[in-house]
Amino acid sequence: MPSTLKARVHVMLKDGVLDPQGEAVKHALGTLGFSGVEAVRQGKVIELDLAATDRASAEAEVRAMCEKLLANTVIEKYRVEIA
């Protein structure tokens, strides 16, 4: 059985980029009585199962995936975790 590594990519809008989904969630939370929420930023988490054994090369490959497809690096930032 081949070894696999799991990668988790957290993608968020960069600071200063308008987050309309986050604002909608913040407004809805206020409507529901959660008045202590000052800001909401919404993002996404992408999980990948990789047929790889070397953590460093797996992370480099996932970062390349982010740069080419998984994140819009003009307006989004990302963080990669390898487990």
Feature annotation, model-predicted:
Residues 1-83:
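Long, contiguous binding/interaction regions
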